[in-house]
Amino acid sequence: MSENFDSALTYNSYLGIDDLLKLQKPLSDGPEHDEMLFIIIHQTYELWFKQLIHEFKQAQKALESGDTYYSLSLLGRIRTILKVCVAQIDILETMTPLQFNAFRSYLSSSSGFQSAQFRKVEALLGRRDTKMASHLPPNVQDEIAEITKGNSLWDSALIYLTKRGHQMPDEVLKRDKSQAYTQNKEVQDVLLKLHRNDPETSIVCERLVDIDEGLQEWRYRHVKMVERTIGQKIGTGGSSGVGYLSTTLSNPVF
């Protein structure tokens, strides 16, 4: 009986709960009560980033195959995940600046700028500024560089539009994908026409805008949370903190 129980798949064993609950390791003396919340929130973000990467890649396949309904499903899921990411900031904001400062010094050189998965999310969305990965380990830099050589989500959307019968200029479809996409008047004209004449395809385009909006909302809330917590101080890891984060607010994805 004991052997059967030990070998049976359980909630704990399937999800690796025992290992998961050992990953929270506060460094502060005591430790400070609020450090646990800080760790769990950021570990949760990393799990969501992993899921976003998973969903983006599948959404690209769906778009490039011309599958409207599956694309809409996946893009809608991505938008919902981004909403959850925004909502988590509400929890983090229950921590006062004084409570954060009680353990901030223990973070030393660690910083959210070192999130390799978020850099991968940005690359999948079309960011081609690889110097933002220069502070990451060489193998991670290589992984991000590899992503930037392929299609971004927007490139996949352009392929989807051709599958739907909307002609795209060759210089856009065959461009060097390692370079950032630049606005193209012919593409803009096509988008304007399809919104008038192809409502089904226009819904897919609206889902992409929803994702852009979701990411911008997350960035805005992140900036305001950091501003509220540390003001204009230098961020952990030596980053410029609010100063840099504010510059990202004017960078739309699409």
Place the predicted regions along the sequence by residue.
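Surface-exposed peri-terminal alpha-helical interaction modules
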Residues: 1-254
